[in-house]
């Protein structure tokens, strides 16, 4: 018996680094085996979601202020003498941004933003000359230079200093116009709902391009290739992905029989079942905010959330079977105690 936390947080960090993405896939494979052969369904449903990173909403002024504050600390480590530390200047310039949407404060906010960018550029230029190429801080300096040089219309922009791989996605949500993180593709069984694959995309690709690596992961983890993948309209553009048939909503064939139409409707109704599964991954299994670093952290966090979801589903199924067995046992006991009249 020990009073205290089960382990230190750094131990989990070392564990994740040791197992990597391949080890996380093995953990997911073990949770799929809990469900037996019922998990290996011929038809699966596929959908994509956004795994948001633990970063603030990026703006030019926020990034410039972070560059100034981080650059001042880095200058102290490398013995670079700056003319000033900007400890009072940066908060004043950030305070000027509060009224940027008002008529009186718009010009003041633009002037403060230009001043912040000028200060950040000055600090980065001094660090660029002082920090050696082999230093660990060199990557930070290069990232800061890219942030200060990027424009509004540029592609592959950097939105975070500590997470430069983050990209912006707009899924058309009314309450959340832009999301910053990594796109995730999730595959689940059509009837059982067991998550068979969870693939994190390194770039913001079209949904159909994410299907092939996701199905390859299903083949590695679950040990089979699904015959049919049912997706939404985001997967349009291809009828087959390797040996797997891709089915998406559409007008259908003109000469389709009533049976084919009914089968298609049932398929697309079942496709919608993956939406609450993804919602539970976010609300119950920590997929709504990813605190792990880098693209490897994106992949591991997604796989661990899927691996935690499958045993939860299995335990609910076992509980339902137990309740069903107890009800049958109770009915038999009552019928034996009070037999029905002949």
List the model feature ranges, each with a label:
Residues 161-177:
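Flexible, glycine/threonine-enriched loop-and-boundary segments that flank and lead into catalytic domains
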Residues 174-221:
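Electropositive, glycine- and tryptophan-enriched low-complexity nucleic-acid-binding patches
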Residues 6-12, 42-52, 186, 193, ...:
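Short, conserved catalytic/metal-binding motifs centered on acidic residues
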Residues 195-198, 207-210, 220-228, 239-241, ...:
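Extended hydrophobic-aromatic, low-complexity segments
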Residues 224-296, 300, 322:
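Helix-centered, glycine/charged polyanion-binding patches within enzymatic domains
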Residues 1-165:
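Active-site- or DNA-interface-adjacent structural scaffold in DNA-acting proteins
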Residues 288, 312-342:
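A short, flexible helix-boundary coil/loop motif
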Residues 167-170, 194-196, 204-206, 235-239, ...:
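Flexible loop/turn segments at secondary-structure boundaries
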């Amino acid at each position: 018996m020990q009073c205290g936390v089960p382990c230190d947080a750094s131990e989990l960090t070392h564990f994740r680094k040791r197992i990597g993405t391949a080890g996380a896939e093995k953990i997911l494979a073990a949770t799929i085996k809990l469900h037996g052969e019922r998990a290996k369904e011929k038809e699966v449903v596929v959908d994509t979601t956004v795994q948001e990173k633990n970063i603030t909403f990026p703006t030019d002024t926020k990034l410039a202020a972070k560059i100034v504050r981080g650059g001042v600390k880095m200058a102290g480590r490398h013995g670079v003498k700056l003319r000033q530390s900007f400890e009072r200047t940066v908060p004043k310039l950030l305070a000027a941004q509060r009224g940027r949407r008002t008529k009186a404060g718009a010009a003041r906010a633009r002037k403060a933003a230009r001043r912040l960018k000028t200060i950040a550029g000055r600090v980065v230029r001094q660090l660029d000359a002082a920090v050696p190429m082999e230093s660990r801080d060199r990557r930070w300096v290069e990232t800061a230079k890219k942030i200060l040089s990027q424009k509004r219309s540029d592609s592959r922009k950097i939105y975070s200093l500590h997470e430069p791989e983050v990209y912006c996605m707009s899924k058309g949500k009314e309450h959340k116009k832009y999301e910053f993180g990594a796109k995730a593709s999730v595959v689940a069984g059509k009837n059982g709902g067991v998550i068979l694959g969870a693939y994190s995309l390194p770039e913001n690709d079209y949904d159909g391009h994410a299907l092939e690596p996701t199905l390859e992961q299903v083949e590695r983890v679950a040990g089979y290739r699904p015959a049919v993948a049912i997706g939404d309209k985001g997967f349009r553009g291809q009828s087959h992905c390797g040996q797997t048939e891709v089915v998406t909503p559409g007008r259908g064939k003109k000469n389709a029989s009533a049976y084919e139409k009914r089968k298609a409707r049932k398929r697309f109704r079942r496709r919608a079942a993956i939406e609450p599964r993804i919602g539970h991954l976010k609300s119950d299994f920590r997929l709504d905010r990813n605190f792990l670093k880098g693209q490897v952290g994106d992949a591991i966090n997604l796989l661990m959330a899927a691996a935690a979801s499958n045993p939860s589903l299995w335990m609910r199924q076992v509980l339902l079977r137990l309740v069903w067995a107890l009800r049958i046992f109770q009915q038999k006991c009552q019928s034996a105690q009070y037999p029905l009249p002949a």
